[in-house]
Swiss-Prot record:
This is Cilia- and flagella-associated protein 299. Its main location: cytoplasm. May be involved in spermatogenesis. InterPro entries: DUF4464. Keywords: Cytoplasm, Nucleus.
Length: 231
């Protein structure tokens, strides 16, 4: 038997049996148990090749192939992971804009500015690291319309216009520069480019500013950044 045939045989066995012990048991006959009177001993003899009705497969080969097949299965499932926005009937421009950017933001691309009233009727605004929020919460509730995406005190920036509370937080993708005399800046950590969110200024290298007309919020602006750094 050549190497390819041997590998195919092991793969077939690994696919058929959950554990190595299950495979050994399949090779033991009723007659073996009658004469040996010990299931453990019967398994050992099959493993050593002295008993059995089929191919001899070493424990380490079985477990190695089992692990490799599982890793490949998980990798394939990750690659085929359905986007949260997939299949949703989205009518509002903001939700459509989020859906278009969802796949890119699995690696960190966009900053979302939102201004609107919270559940207490207070006006709040802030900048959201879209990629970070995607990783830390389920966006199903937003795309399905069950909840509205709003800035939180844990986002890149948060401001409550009633209480005048202002909070800034750096994220895995962006460093907040809050002490800039000309206004708030964000530095993209991957390529260290500056994103300027001042509406009167250019957003910066490799960045675009897109105001979104939406019926869900008072104001929405999405900043998209394209990293030129090789990864």
């Amino acid at each position: 038997m050549d190497q390819d045939e041997a590998l195919t045989t092991v793969d077939n066995i690994v696919t058929q049996f959950n554990t190595y012990e299950d495979f050994l048991d399949s090779q033991i006959t009723t007659l073996d148990l009658y004469y040996l009177e010990d299931e453990g001993l019967a398994r050992q003899l099959v493993e050593l090749g002295y008993r059995g009705t089929g191919e001899v497969v070493k424990r380490e080969d079985f477990e190695a192939r089992k692990a490799a097949i599982e890793i490949a299965r998980l990798a394939e499932r990750t690659q085929k992971k359905t986007l949260t926005s997939a299949g949703k009937d989205l009518h509002d421009n903001f939700l459509k804009a989020l859906a278009v950017r969802e796949e890119d933001n699995r690696s960190g691309k966009s900053v979302i500015f939102i201004r609107d009233k919270n559940s207490h009727g207070q006006e709040v605004s802030g900048y959201i690291d879209y990629a970070h929020r995607l990783k830390t919460e389920d966006f199903e509730v937003y795309f399905s319309g069950k909840k509205r995406l709003l800035p939180r005190p844990t986002d890149m920036s948060f401001y409550n216009w009633d209480s005048h509370i202002a909070i800034w937080n750096s994220t895995p993708n962006y460093q907040v520069i809050a002490d800039n005399p000309e206004g708030l800046l964000f530095k993209y950590k991957r390529d260290r480019k500056i994103l300027n969110v001042d509406p009167k200024a250019q957003p910066g290298d490799n960045s675009t500013r897109s105001p979104i007309l939406t019926e869900l919020y008072t104001q929405v602006v999405i900043f998209d950044h394209v990293s030129r750094r090789k990864t």
